[in-house]
């Protein structure tokens, strides 16, 4: 005899309706450490090969090319003049010292030659690529997406040329990307501390939420931003943008962890330490970079107090600082005077609206006389700073996707990358009359790459798709990365000064504005 259970009417499942936003998941960074470091090692090796191979070529008959002609000699002067430049005859000592000090390190090792004045820039180029791979891995929580970002930056023409020439922008890129990475780690660390406070029941002890303790990653970001400003003044833009970004991170974290008054909590608990870490610390680092200038008896404008500026001061400011201010103001006047309306023009200048798609690159060097080695009667050797079109030509849809993800989907990863990109782009519209060049966009390249890699991650890891669609996504991303690498390989001769035929040179110049 079979006994059956009495029929029962199972109650319908009641949907859970949360009266408040759900708490964020306990996700504070990638967990696949071994795979992450293996990816990093591969990316670093590829970056080193591309950045250091044939680093000493080309030159202008053994001398620097383009604006290397300013910075390589000034760095050499620093080596032999107690850390300061000794030849201001042309009035072109118009940037802070850190970038030139780094160039001088390479010259101290290898001497006054192309490898010497480019070595430090190549090292920083490799570091930047590794940083972008690691940062994108942390943003996406995917080692694969981080590796894609590293490959894309390796194959970017702007980053490639910036890493292999002794200009200051490559160093600036390294410092701002490193500072950005520190603030991303700081964001994860803040959320880990907020999570511990939640578990301990300390979230609502006060209306403003818990104190978050010493935040060393944010302090490190301040040091790096100070070094950025001590390389080029445009580092100040990143101080402002990154400062607002990290404060926004804090407000959102306090809101998501249900702090009763998150805005006031961020202002009360976080604003003061943020100002210290991202304003006071960078200013201190900037002043410290002038230590050789303060110690010198012959540095430019070192003893202006009592000469071109009076001995008396309304405030008890040391004469050395007053002299530095006088020198700084003179540099500011130099830069502010480089305007088109005053008759300052350059055949390769450009305006910022042309930068996102690399519409007006910069020709660093060209030689068409007595050049051989291309297998044709007429050969060309040229170095052009130009973005790899497979990435830069899609900048507008990439930015559109990033804005949509940031605003509509509230995806903080794209928002953070947009902040970095905007810091390198938007401030240049303030004075559009100023003489500007595409190499100013070098700071935009890493953040463009991050956004492209994050889009690749969206395609690879789109939730709710079947295996067939996932495979198609993998194929699409693989084809795109292969396209970028192929495009870079095609442009390689005009990024490195290899001899090519005149017909090949004409094929390399894709747009009329590239001429």
What kind of region is each of these model predictions?
Residues 1-53, 269-282, 470-479:
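Start-transfer (signal-anchor) and selected internal transmembrane alpha helices
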Residues 121, 161-171, 231-234:
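Short acidic/glycine- and proline-prone juxtamembrane loop motifs at membrane-interface regions
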Residues 52-58, 63, 67-101, 105, ...:
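Extracytosolic helix-loop segments that constitute the early lumenal/periplasmic catalytic or substrate-binding loops
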Residues 2-8, 209-217, 225, 244, ...:
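Transmembrane helical bundles and short interhelical boundary loops of multi-pass, membrane-embedded
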Residues 119-140, 178, 397-402:
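Transmembrane-helix motifs of polytopic, lipid-linked glycan transferases
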Residues 12, 179-217, 247-257:
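Membrane-interface transmembrane helices that cradle and orient dolichyl/undecaprenyl
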């Amino acid at each position: 005899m079979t006994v059956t259970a009495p029929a029962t009417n199972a109650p319908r499942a009641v949907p859970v309706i949360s009266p408040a936003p759900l708490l964020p998941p306990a996700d504070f960074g990638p967990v696949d450490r071994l795979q992450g470091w293996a990816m990093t090692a591969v990316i670093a090796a590829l970056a080193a090969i591309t950045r250091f191979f044939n680093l000493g070529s080309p030159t202008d008959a053994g001398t620097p090319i383009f604006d290397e002609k300013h910075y390589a000699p000034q760095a050499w002067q620093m080596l032999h003049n107690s850390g300061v430049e000794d030849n201001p005859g042309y009035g072109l000592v118009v940037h802070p010292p850190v970038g030139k000090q780094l160039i001088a390190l390479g010259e101290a090792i290898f001497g006054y030659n192309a490898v010497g004045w480019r070595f430090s820039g190549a090292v920083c180029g490799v570091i930047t690529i590794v940083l972008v791979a690691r940062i994108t891995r942390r943003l996406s929580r995917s080692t694969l997406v981080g590796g894609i970002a590293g490959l894309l930056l390796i194959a970017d023409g702007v980053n490639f040329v910036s890493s292999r020439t002794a200009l200051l922008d490559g160093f600036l890129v390294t410092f701002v990307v490193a500072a950005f990475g520190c603030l991303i780690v700081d964001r994860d660390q803040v959320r880990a501390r907020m999570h511990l406070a939640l578990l301990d029941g300390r979230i609502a002890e006060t209306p403003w939420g818990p104190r978050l303790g010493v935040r060393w990653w944010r302090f490190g970001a301040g040091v790096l931003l100070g070094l950025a400003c001590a390389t080029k003044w445009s580092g100040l833009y990143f101080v402002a943008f990154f400062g607002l970004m990290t404060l926004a991170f804090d407000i959102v974290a306090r809101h998501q962890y249900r702090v009763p008054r998150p805005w006031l909590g961020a202002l009360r608990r976080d604003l003061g330490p943020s100002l210290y870490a991202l304003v006071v610390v960078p200013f201190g680092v900037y002043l410290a970079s002038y230590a050789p200038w303060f110690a010198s008896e012959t540095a430019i404008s070192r003893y202006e107090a009592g000469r071109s500026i009076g001995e008396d001061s309304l405030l008890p400011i040391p004469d050395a600082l007053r002299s530095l201010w006088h020198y700084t103001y003179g540099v500011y006047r130099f830069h502010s005077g480089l305007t088109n309306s005053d008759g300052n023009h350059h055949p390769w200048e450009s305006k910022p609206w042309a930068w996102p798609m690399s519409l007006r690159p910069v020709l660093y060097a060209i030689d068409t006389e007595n050049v051989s080695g291309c297998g044709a009667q007429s050969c060309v050797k040229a170095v052009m700073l130009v973005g790899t079109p497979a990435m830069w030509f899609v900048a507008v849809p990439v930015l559109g996707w990033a804005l949509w993800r940031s605003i509509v989907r509230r995806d903080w990863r794209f928002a953070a990358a947009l902040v970095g990109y905007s810091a390198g782009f938007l401030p240049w519209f303030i004075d559009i009359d100023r003489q500007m060049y595409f190499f100013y966009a070098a700071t935009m390249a890493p953040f463009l790459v991050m956004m492209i890699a994050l889009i690749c991650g969206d395609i690879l890891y789109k939730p709710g798709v079947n295996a067939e669609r996932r495979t198609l996504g993998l194929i699409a991303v693989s084809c795109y990365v292969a396209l970028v690498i192929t495009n870079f390989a095609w442009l390689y001769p005009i990024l490195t000064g290899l001899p090519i035929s005149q017909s090949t040179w004409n094929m390399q110049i894709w747009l009329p504005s590239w001429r």
